[in-house]
Amino acid sequence: MDDLEAVLSRVRDRAVPEPAERDRLRTVAVELADRTREAIADLPVDADVVQVGSTARDTWVSGDRDIDLFVRFDAALDREQLEEYGLAVGHAVLPDGHEEYAEHPYVKGTYEGFDVDLVPCHDVETAGDLISAVDRTPFHDAYLSARLDEGLADDVVLAKAFLKGIGAYGSDLRTEGFSGYLTELLVLELGGFVPLVESARSWHPPVEFDPEGHAERTFDDPLVVVDPTDPTRNVAAVLSAENLARFQHYARELLAAPSEAPFEPVDPAPLDPTDVRDHLDRRETTPVAVVFDAPDLVDDQLWPQLRRSLDGIVRGLNDRGFDVLRARAMTDGSGPEADGDGAKRAALYAELEVAERPAVTRHEGPPVAVRKHAASFYESYADDVDPETYGPFIDGDRYVVEREREFTTVREYLESDAAGDVALGAQVEREFAERDVLVGDAVATLAPAFGVPLREFYEPHP
């Protein structure tokens, strides 16, 4: 078995950027900052530019090519002008860039092979004075830059490489993982990468860290790291319980059997239709997929709606006796036919233990001894002339009826209006009306577009 320090030394050698890589990034960042200042000079208001993020703090993993520049405008500038001037600067610096939207629009593009975000914000005095969420980012950068020495910075790189390798890195709402800022705060708080994983293996959520001891509220999240620049904010709010558990699992594995494997992301190969059918034959369950056009939304808006919709469909299936073994939302954005412009189709995919139910279902009333409620139940069915209803009769101590089941097959339910009555995301609901329903072997036809998430579904691991 490899010694842990030997493993980390090898990972550090390839994950920490070489001087030439750092110098190249710094040169490009300086060029971009100069271009930004030139664009600012053409505005009728004052502003400055600051580089933020991991590439500003030498805490990025080798190969990352992200440069984040924030243009800080006077706090008195209204939101409309901030957006107007911010976009003007962004398009001047990145003429081939495009607009994206966080709390307000910004420009994203490429320059000399680097991915660049040029974000306008307000130049507020403290993070507590923020006008929009992005205003706090320069304070994050200043806090960490003042505290991370070279050794801790290298340990941050190890932590990020580890989290990327296990699939738990990224605060986007698709991943729900560890943000870069959260990762750096944890390394700083625990004193290094090894102390972090040694601590994490024994965590019993909820776990809370408050670096500045200034929390002004309580939080309900499984991991709480109070923002040292904002006592009302949990930096780990986006982190899912699943990704926290995943981190703990691999922390234990790394310490028990040191290996470079957790630091090496593996892109799963897509399943083909034959692979899917092989899994179906072996599992003898009934898969179903509700497939529809993905709403034209950025991932941070799309994925919460897909998860909400999946939860609604799963509840609907379970409530009608089609017992769901496992389910997940999928998009074709990572499939081999994806064109890089985001998801075009989405699927709510579930594996069922039961796909067909009897024509009747049992409905229990209250115990006969509960006079008022029992009488109401009895009378409501005693006068029912529906020939498909059996009873009411007494079974044990209560009234029971057996009545016609609304849906006997899962296809009937998923193709009915009732399937759309569950809690769906607002934009998903519109597309859901034009859904396709696949049952059984028919789901294998999804493989060309959904092969990667299908492999993740049928070959799960921590």
UniProtKB/Swiss-Prot annotation:
Name of protein:
CCA-adding enzyme
Entry keyword set: ATP-binding, Magnesium, Metal-binding, Nucleotide-binding, Nucleotidyltransferase, RNA repair, RNA-binding, Transferase, tRNA processing
Q: Where does ATP bind?
A: S54, R57, H140, K160, Y169
Biological process (GO) annotations held by this record are: RNA repair; tRNA 3'-terminal CCA addition
**InterPro entries associated with the record:** CAA_C, CCA-adding_arc, CCA_tRNA_nucleotrans_2, NT_2-5OAS_ClassI-CCAase, NT_sf, NuclTrfase_I-like_C, Polymerase_NTP_transf_dom, tRNA_NucTransf2
Q: Which residues bind CTP?
A: S54, R57, H140, K160, Y169
- Name of the encoding gene: cca
Per the record, the coiled-coil ranges are: none
EC numbers on record: 2.7.7.72
- Name what cofactor the protein needs: Mg(2+)
**Something else known:** A single active site specifically recognizes both ATP and CTP and is responsible for their addition.
Chain sites annotated for binding Mg(2+)? D66, D68, D117
What this protein is reported to do is described as: Catalyzes the addition and repair of the essential 3'-terminal CCA sequence in tRNAs without using a nucleic acid template. Adds these three nucleotides in the order of C, C, and A to the tRNA nucleotide-73, using CTP and ATP as substrates and producing inorganic pyrophosphate. tRNA 3'-terminal CCA addition is required both for tRNA processing and repair. Also involved in tRNA surveillance by mediating tandem CCA addition to generate a CCACCA at the 3' terminus of unstable tRNAs. While stable tRNAs receive only 3'-terminal CCA, unstable tRNAs are marked with CCACCA and rapidly degraded.
Family, per the entry? Belongs to the tRNA nucleotidyltransferase/poly(A) polymerase family. Archaeal CCA-adding enzyme subfamily.
Q: Does the keyword Calcium apply?
A: no
CDD domains recorded for this chain? NT_2-5OAS_ClassI-CCAase
Q: What are this entry's molecular-function GO terms? A: ATP binding; CCA tRNA nucleotidyltransferase activity; magnesium ion binding; tRNA binding
Catalyzed chemical reaction(s) = a tRNA precursor + 2 CTP + ATP = a tRNA with a 3' CCA end + 3 diphosphate; a tRNA with a 3' CCA end + 2 CTP + ATP = a tRNA with a 3' CCACCA end + 3 diphosphate
Partners and quaternary state? Homodimer.
Keyword Ribonucleoprotein tagged: no
